[in-house]
UniProtKB/Swiss-Prot annotation:
Protein function: Cell wall formation.
Protein's name in the database: D-alanine--D-alanine ligase
Residue sites binding Mg(2+) 1 per the record: 265, 279
Main location per the UniProt record: cytoplasm
EC number: 6.3.2.4
Any single biological process term in GO: peptidoglycan biosynthetic process
Chain positions recorded as ATP binding sites: 139-193
Residue ranges of domain ATP-grasp in the record: 112-312
Pathway named in the protein's UniProt entry: Cell wall biogenesis; peptidoglycan biosynthesis
Organism: Caulobacter vibrioides (strain ATCC 19089 / CIP 103742 / CB 15)
Compartment(s) of residence: Cytoplasm
Domain of life: Bacteria
Keywords annotated in UniProt: ATP-binding, Cell shape, Cell wall biogenesis/degradation, Cytoplasm, Ligase, Magnesium, Manganese, Metal-binding, Nucleotide-binding, Peptidoglycan synthesis
């Protein structure tokens, strides 16, 4: 449903294509994010074309002729540098991170190497062949097994302390997340998240959220099912830990070369005062109740204003001489 524009309509006269859906395992989440952003853009006065991209996305965009693209895709192809490369080829301004940062952040092993070199604390472990992981414990339990290039906690297994068997599902023919998997020691404690805005004078961390999953693990269902998790904002942590998480998120945003909005996910072991950055999301969820918009609202940036900032940030980069 087309939204009525605001009286001031700051995006009046703009034609913005919103990419939503796509082919990844996070399609459903992207459809919700994209719908919310498209409605906000219409309230801001823009003409909006909603595009659920397929193999012909370049031709569709060329025929649609938007002024810019709002990328609301999540996961494979939309968040890993692929669609960003298409948009660069078409010379279309687009939101969020560019080709290199998107590809780096999606590849957990490469991202960890870059972040560690920049001084960010990341988990140990590494990449293993999935069949080796399925046959025997490659680390002493407890540990975590996850795809090297997926988001939304898709395909993640936690092997608890004292577990007798490894995650045999990883070696099954039905496994579709690549031949190598990331295996890391399990870090006890709190699940924290920090959203960052890549402002012109440097990245700005917004707040720290404590995420409490009803099942004890913040998996896909906990993230997107009603009642699956509780977001405690601000997180009930010492000020020094809050500041450390925010600075670490800003450093990660810069080290990976990210732009626009990102969200860094952490584990905090309060017993040992260990704060570890798990991953950086270059296309964080953008429903009004997602973590990044929640934090923006917490610091005085309502959802529509956050969407406007994302668009204006992309336009500013374009006018400064880059596609995005």
């Amino acid at each position: 449903m087309t939204q009525q524009p605001q009286a001031d309509a700051p995006l009046a006269g703009r034609h913005i294509a919103v990419l939503l859906g796509g082919p990844s395992s996070e399609r459903k989440v992207s459809l919700v994010s994209g719908a919310a952003c498209a409605e906000a853009l219409e309230r801001l006065g823009a003409k909006v074309s909603r595009i659920d991209p397929g193999p012909d996305v370049a031709q569709v965009l060329a025929a649609t002729k938007p002024d810019m693209v709002f990328n609301a895709l999540h996961g494979e192809w939309g968040e890993d540098g692929c669609v960003q490369g298409v948009l660069e080829t078409l010379k279309l301004p687009y939101t969020h991170s560019g080709v290199l940062a998107s590809a780096l952040a999606m590849d957990k092993a490469k991202a960890k190497a870059v972040l560690a070199a920049a001084g960010v604390t990341v988990p140990g472990g590494g990449l293993f062949n999935r069949h080796d992981v399925a046959r025997d414990h490659v680390l002493q339990p407890p540990y975590v097994v996850k795809p090297n290039a997926e988001g939304s906690s898709v395909g993640v297994f936690i092997i608890k302390e004292g577990a007798n068997r490894p995650p045999e599902e990883v070696g099954a023919p039905s496994w579709t997340f690549g031949e190598e998997v990331m295996v890391e020691p399990y870090i006890q404690g709190m699940e924290l998240a920090v959203a960052v805005l890549g402002e012109s004078n440097g990245p700005r961390a917004l707040a720290v959220t404590d995420i409490r999953a009803s099942t004890g693990f913040y998996d896909y269902e906990a993230k997107y099912s009603e009642g699956g998790s509780i977001h405690v904002l601000p997180a009930p942590i010492p000020n020094a830990v809050r500041d450390r998480a925010m600075r670490m998120a800003e450093l990660a945003h810069t080290a990976l070369g990210c732009r626009g909005v990102t969200r860094s996910d952490f584990r905090y072991d309060d017993i040992n005062d260990l704060l570890v950055l798990l991953e950086v999301n270059t296309q964080p969820g953008m429903t009004p109740t997602s973590l990044a918009p929640e934090q923006a609202d917490h610091v005085g940036i309502p959802f529509d204003q956050l969407v406007l900032w994302i668009v204006e940030d992309a336009y500013a980069r374009c006018s400064a001489g880059g596609t995005a």
